[in-house]
A protein has these predicted regions:
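PAPS-dependent sulfotransferase catalytic core
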Residues: 1-126, 237-307
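Residue-level detector of alpha-helical secondary structure
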Residues: 12, 197, 271-274, 294, ...
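PAPS/PAP-binding and catalytic site of the sulfotransferase fold
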Residues: 71-82, 208-235, 252-267
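A structural signal for well-ordered alpha-helical scaffolds and beta->alpha junctions
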Residues: 72, 103, 159, 189-193, ...
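A short acidic, often aromatic-flanked loop/helix-cap motif at beta-alpha or helix-coil junctions
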Residues: 94-97, 214-219, 243
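Short low-complexity, flexible loop/linker segments enriched in glycine and/or proline
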Residues: 101-104, 224, 250
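PAPS-dependent sulfotransferase catalytic domain
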Residues: 127, 132-236
Length: 323
């Protein structure tokens, strides 16, 4: 049983002991005990091996990150439809392989798809939902430890109305993770933004912020992002619509490269079919103030964790807005 409040305080205080903390196995998603440091070292080694197999010109890497259900796959598909190689959480795929004790031979599929194509490749990574390890793992740190040059990376931190994200977490995963743990994991995954941003700051990686935007404002929001990251000439509004397909594992995102997940993590219909970016039912909860959901967390003994997370995330947002 994790002390979630202690984990949150360690994140908030940038406690280096967090990486050495014992993470017990659950027998389903995580087969063996481990630490974040051990996972990071192992995944970085796997990445170095994969990148070495595709040695050559290093592309600019646009690195999308957010908590699960932030709208990252839909945004990734915009890049894919715009002609970029766009890979669905390749680093998390390696992490899950390590958690699930896959052998090296089981990495064959990710090896076949993990080629970063010059001059520009886009990947998306997320935090959560099944294990504390997934919530607190830092994929950007693993990438940098693999030897990928930070000068070729740009980070895009994604956000979405938290009440909508929580509703989506509950809708997709409440049958696979206990309600209390799922709510705690949700808050830890959001707090992990501090660790991601810190890794970028320490490596002098530029950071861009993007809010998943439904409806009529979606086109201008994505257009502004393309301009900010230096891709204004590649933006075409028509790429945000006309999506087809309803694959059980890939949804409507047929242009994205999807490495196959370890069996324990596969979930049919995780990706709802969308006709285009911002056109789905992105808003599942009409309450715009996430604090109105406090009682849900209190009922699961997570009141202190909720307060810590809301205060920390609000302070971070206010500081960025002031800057």
């Amino acid at each position: 049983m994790h002390d979630f409040e202690t984990l949150a305080r360690m994140i908030i205080n940038d406690d280096p002991q967090l990486d050495a903390l014992h993470l017990p196995a659950d027998g389903i998603f995580q087969k063996v005990p481990t630490t974040l440091e051990e996972l990071t070292c192992n995944v970085a080694a796997d990445l170095a091996d994969l990148l070495g197999r595709h040695a050559g010109q290093v592309p600019t890497l646009t690195f999308l990150w957010g908590p699960c259900r932030v709208g990252s796959t839909a945004l990734l598909n915009v890049f894919a439809e715009s002609g970029f190689k766009a890979i669905y959480q390749p680093i998390k795929n390696l992490l899950r392989g390590r958690l699930n004790q896959q052998s090296k031979s089981d990495h064959s599929e990710i090896m076949s798809v993990f080629s970063l194509s010059p001059p520009w490749t886009v990947v998306k990574e997320t935090s959560g939902p099944y294990t504390v390890a997934e919530c607190l793992f830092n994929p950007l740190d693993a990438l940098l430890r693999s030897g990928f040059p930070p000068s070729k990376v740009q980070l895009v931190v994604l956000s979405r109305e938290p009440a909508d994200m929580l509703a989506s977490w509950t809708r997709k995963w409440s049958s696979r993770v206990s309600t209390g743990d799922l709510h705690a994991h949700f808050l830890l995954a959001r707090l992990n933004e501090r660790r991601i941003r810190r890794a970028a700051e320490q490596a002098s990686i530029p950071v861009f912020n993007f809010t998943s935007t439904p409806g009529v404002e979606a086109v201008s929001a994505v257009g502004n992002l393309f301009e900010a990251i230096g891709l204004a000439d590649r933006f075409e509004p028509t790429r945000l619509e006309g999506w087809g397909g309803s694959d059980p594992l890939c949804g409507s995102f047929s242009s994205v490269v999807f490495p196959r997940e370890p069996k324990a993590f596969e979930l049919s219909n995780l990706h709802d079919p969308l006709p285009g970016y911002g056109m789905g039912n992105l808003s599942l909860d009409r309450s715009s103030d996430f604090r109105t959901h406090e009682q849900i967390f209190v009922s699961h003994g997570l009141g202190e964790l909720f307060g810590l997370a809301v205060e920390t995330l609000s302070a971070g947002r206010d500081a960025r807005n002031a800057g």
